[in-house]
Structures are given as structure tokens and as C-alpha cells.
Amino acid sequence: MKPQLSWKVGGQQGEGIESTGEIFATAMNRKRYYLYGYRHFSSRIKGGHTNNKIRVSTTPVHAISDDLDILIAFDQETIDVNHHEMREDSIILADAKAKPVKPEGCHAQLIELPFTATAKELGTALMKNMVAIGATSALMNLNTNTFEELITNMFSKKGDKVVEVNIQALNEGYQLMQSRLPEIDGDFELESTDALPHLYMIGNDAIGLGAIAAGSQFMAAYPITPASEVMEYMIANISKVNGAVIQTEDEIAAVTMAIGANYGGVRAFTASAGPGLSLMMEAIGLSGMTETPLVIINTQRGGPSTGLPTKQEQSDLMQMIYGTHGDIPKIVVAPTDAEDAFYLTMEAFNLAEQYQCPVIVLSDLQLSLGKQTVEKLDYNRIEIKRGEIIQSDIEREEDDKGYFKRYALTSNGVSPRPIPGVKGGIHHITGVEHNEEGKPSESASNRQQQMEKRMRKIEQLVIESPVEANLQHEDADILYIGFISTKGAIQEGSNRLNQQGIKVNTIQIRQLHPFPTSVIQDAVNKAKKVVVVEHNYLGQLASIIKMNVNIHDKIENYTKYDGTPFLPHEIEEKGKIIATEIKEMV
């Protein structure tokens, strides 16, 4: 028996590859295993290779596995492009229809099974996925009851006949594999687990749930990969809190609607990806100038321009910090996994209202669309804090006929914020430079005072946990620094290095702007070499760190920009190279 294994299904896009992986993963989640799933797919509806890789474990996992134990292949291309992940004790279960051939250098065992032919005998080739799931069950010695329950839940609305024939396809696949088990070399059975029940969700769903838990009642957005699932989640769930979602004509309309709703006192947000954020920049500046709270979710993808819409990248960082024209107060935070996405999204809504400025939650495709185990969420962990909002009438002197000082020059830069309709709170609002009442002003002294007031709000800002750190060594050989979805690969690769006697500390940065300089500097001082891991060509995170931390003599970039996520073995191999260089320097 194994403590963990990796399973992948592959074929042509539009053939149910995603749903096949979803059925397998959901069943394993119900059996209380820990999971990490990642889909490879193209920017098209049908055609082209796609796959869904699921890592299943008796203990928590946070990264894509380096290798592959079981490959379900519906065509030859799936074998050709994935066999390099397999070992001698791995297995390929291939559809006989594809007339599969092992490529040169492929050491895995190949078993042909009539997935499509069996499905056609039952009525339709579409059920080949169920036949494959059944074969997987037999190979892994899994009871099919959980799969049968899932099939019943999935197809009950289509009638008993549809449920029955899909369960029959499942069992036919099970029997096909059972008859071939004597030929199998290797162990594909998992150890049992006594873990408590847990969730299995994509990062975008966690973001949507976090927004609702934070009290958001309005979202405006335009569909874009890989952010659309946030909007889809909100559409499905926001009515439960008497909220609404508007699909706008473009991203400019989306962000300005969100600003308007926030001005009216409703917690509101928008979500998009790089191209959409480019269109939103002027409006984000409006949020900063008018000191109107705004939460924006940016799920990064491959750029520039249309770029690689369905591939992994982290190349929007500089734009998120410096993209608007002019200087505005702005907060940029970055979750480290799906669970953190829930909590940090909740916190983002608090920050937006407390500091009256735009807050960008920076995700990436791997975190947003990757699916992973999430422990039971604590809805009371983050208290809703609305800052200096005024929702009841303001008592003013009878002879005070002037506008309310919405932009009063306070010591911390945060001014009282009456929502429209509050008696005594009338004020002017404009994107033009303004005085304390909001009226346009070009006075040099007023400009200086208002600019300093706005920027003063975030000068000392440090969120509750600006980094997620593992600083177990006072004299580390290597400090790995990353952000967003690189956490899992860094964590696992670093654990391997530590086991080999190479002392490694790690940091995932959650607060990117304003930058938590002192926290990072302390960690840097404890390491001989600092390696910044990120998915972009220029090393944007490394540049931000260099701008804020005394680190130039020990920093090294480790960038990847081919659209694929970092794997644990890449972090491990990089660490070995660095450790060798350190020894040679001594």
C-alpha cells in the first residue's frame, strides 16, 4: 500500500476529461483523502489535448506531484505528452480504440482496455469516462459505492435509466480491470486514512465564499479566464445574502459600478485578469483619489496582450503596484493557497473600508483554478470592520451651512465617510484634486496637504500576517521567497533539502504593497543566499524586494515563464546547486 499516489486522465478537450477527474477526486475526497488537482487545458471549447492531474494522499499536500503513478489515456497524444512523468512502476490504462503504442523511453506498463467499445455497447461512447473510472477503482482496490452515490447524485434529474446505465458502465470497467490484475506489476492501493471530513475547492470558489462571508452584496464583472469562476460562484450564491451580480459590457463598467456601490455603503467588488486590469487602471485611480473603498481580484495568467489565457504566470505584480497614473494609496495582498484565499479576501474588504482605498487581491491561475483540500473554515476568525463609515445622521450646528468635511486633514489620513442620504453629511466628490469638502481646488498648499493625507493612510500599514514563514534556522544556507501558488512547491522542495542537511528557510509574502520591509529584512539576515521563486521573465518580485531590502549581495532570481507551474523537484534541484556554490565560496 502507498501513502499517496498521482492519477491523471487525458484526451481531447470537450470529451469530458474535466468531469472524469472531478468524479474521481470528489470520491477520494469523500473517502477523506487529501487532494491537489491541476488541469491543463487550451483556449478553445473543443479539440486539443487536455488533462486533469490529481494527487491523492493520506497527509496534506500543497503541490502538483513530480511524477505520475496512473495515466488514463483516451488517445495516443495523451501518452506521448505525459509519459515523461512516469516511472517503471507506473501504469498506463489506454483506450484500445487509440491503438496505443509506448513511446521510446517510456518505462511504464501499458494495459489496453476497451473503454470506448464497452461504452458503445451500453448505448453511447460518452460513457467511456465511467468505464475508465471503474477500471481505476479496480486497480486501486476501491469500493465502488462512493462512485455509485456520485453518479446517482449527478444524473438523478435525467431519470433512473441514465443513472442505471452509468453505474453499469462503472461496473463494466471494474470487471475489465479485475480480469487484467494478474498482469499488473506494482502496487496502486492507498493506505486508509483517519482524517476528518474536509472541503475540496478551487481558489476562485474560496475567494467568492470569502467575499460573501465578508458581507459583500454586490459584484460587477466581465467574464475572463481565469477569473470567471469567481463571478459564477457569486451568481450561484449571492442571492442567499440578498445580493446581486451584474455581468457588465466590459471591465471599465464593472470596476466603476463597484466603486459606485461602495460609495453608496455596500461592500462591492470586481474580479478580472491581466487584460481586464489594464482597462481598469484609470478607475482604480479614481477610487484612490476619491478615497472610496474598492476590492479587486486579479487572477493572473500568461501575458502580455491576450497571451496565454489558460496558463500559469505571475507577471502583473509591477502593474498592480505602480500601474495607475499618479500616486494613490493602494494595498496589494496575495493569498498562498485556497484556504488562505478565503481568509485574505475577507480581510481585503476590511482593509478597503478601514483605509478607504483600493485593495487588490493578487491570485494566479494555479491558485485560482487548481483544486485542493481545504480544512473546515472558521467564519468567526475575521471580524467585519468598516472603519470610519457614518450611517446615521450627523448633528451639526444650526448655523453650519457648509459641506461636510469628507476629506478632513486627520492625523492618520483617514477621514469620516458618510454614505449618501446621511443628514448633515452632504459633500462633493470628484476625481479632480479637491479640498476638505470635496470641492475642486488647484491650490498648491491644498494639493500638498491632500496628497500627504491620502498617502499617510498606508505609510505604516502592516496586515496581521504579512508573510507566511518557516524560519527554523538561525543560520540558513538558503532562504526561498515566493508568493501565491509557489508555496506548495517551495514547501515540499525545501523539506527535502532540509532532510538532506541543507538548511532552508522559506517565506511566502502575503502583503506585497506597502512592502513589509522589516519582516523580510530579518529573514534575509538569517540566510547566506536568498532565492526568489516566481513565474515571470523579469523577476518582478525580486525587483520589489531589492527596492525595499538590503539584499543585493545575496539575492538570486529563479524564474519560470513557460506557462507551467513550479514542481517540488525543481526547487530541490535549484537548492542543491546553490548549496554547492555556497560550499565553494567558503
Question: Model-predicted segments: where are they?
Answer:
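Thiamine diphosphate
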Residues: 2-66, 70-83, 226-322, 331-352, ...
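Short gly/pro/ser/thr-enriched loop/turn and capping motifs at secondary-structure boundaries
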Residues: 42-45, 99-101, 118, 228, ...
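Active-site cofactor/cluster-binding pocket
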Residues: 1-214, 218-220
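Short beta-strand segments
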Residues: 73, 93-95, 114, 272, ...
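Gly-rich Lys/Arg/Thr-decorated short loops/hinges at beta-loop-alpha junctions or inter-strand turns
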Residues: 4, 152-155, 179-196, 211-215, ...
